[in-house]
Amino acid sequence: MQLCGFEVGIDQPLFLIAGPCVIESQEMAIETAGQLKEITTALGINFIYKSSYDKANRSSNKTFRGFGMDEGLKILDEVRRQVGVPILTDVHTEAQVPHVAAVVDVLQTPAFLCRQTDFITACAQSGKPVNIKKGQFLAPGDMKQVVQKAKEANGGADTIMVCERGASFGYNTLISDMRGLAIMRETNCPVVFDATHSVQQPGGQGDKSGGQREFVPVLARAAVASGVAGVFMETHPDPAQALSDGPNAWPLSKMKALLEVLVDLDRVVKKAGFIEHTV
């Protein structure tokens, strides 16, 4: 699949989607994107910057949601202009799709909305690549139907990615079943693993979600060893002070060290091939 000027897939080098959970300021967005670009350029990793203009599914209405669509899109457009990186952001309603698609390079659908047919259809018809997050409530094999809806809407174009972000396992807990990554490859779409939301503890701090960022490298390594097209990681210069999803954000200062390991793993795994495809 062609994505932002490069090829992605199970037979292509690992690519990265990364950035702060929510836009906190234009200055921080530009600085973070610049540092990530420097890191990924040095490591030869294709990179897409991610940040949200609105966190529409916060646990509480007392927590920070973001700048809103209009101001947020202006900031993301400025990040692309100044830093020179492609941009991905979430879209939350059908009405937002044309406005967001006019600015960013890749649309992302929230996991909670993966079963909303009209919403998925609108995103797929936008003309932009779409990263569809698998719902925490959905079996990996059920993503075939989600992809079918999207492909029927976009005329069968290769513009759809699917993203694993953990499965609900009791209250306030997510787990990652690495078999799901192989199952989702059967959609014939690039598979992305969200290593940071997979360690989230939804609603685990009462009015906001908790997380266990120490397990981000554990799951990221396992996913890359299983075989994925890309990795998604939210990162922050100071996760303890992040306005959204700080407990599961990976520290920006540790991003290069983690990516070095993931790139090495990716090369080994993809060079060896996938013997599971032979049985």
Curated annotation (Swiss-Prot):
The UniProt family comment states: Belongs to the KdsA family.
Q: Can you name one GO molecular function term for this protein?
A: 3-deoxy-8-phosphooctulonate synthase activity
Q: Can you list the disulfide-bonded cysteine pairs? A: none
The UniProt keywords, alphabetically, are:
Cytoplasm, Lipopolysaccharide biosynthesis, Transferase
Q: Which Enzyme Commission number(s) are listed? A: 2.5.1.55
Q: What is the lineage of its organism?
A: Bacteria, Pseudomonadati, Pseudomonadota, Betaproteobacteria, Nitrosomonadales
Q: Where in the cell is it found?
A: Cytoplasm
The reply to whether Transferase figures as a keyword in the UniProt entry is yes
InterPro entries in UniProt: Aldolase_TIM, DAHP1/KDSA, KDO8P_synthase
Q: Which Gene3D superfamilies match?
A: Aldolase class I (3.20.20.70)
The protein's organism comes out as Methylobacillus flagellatus (strain ATCC 51484 / DSM 6875 / VKM B-1610 / KT)
Q: Which reaction does it catalyse?
A: D-arabinose 5-phosphate + phosphoenolpyruvate + H2O = 3-deoxy-alpha-D-manno-2-octulosonate-8-phosphate + phosphate
Q: What is this protein called?
A: 2-dehydro-3-deoxyphosphooctonate aldolase
Please give the pathway this protein is involved in: Carbohydrate biosynthesis; 3-deoxy-D-manno-octulosonate biosynthesis; 3-deoxy-D-manno-octulosonate from D-ribulose 5-phosphate: step 2/3; Bacterial outer membrane biogenesis; lipopolysaccharide biosynthesis
A cellular-component GO term for this protein: cytoplasm
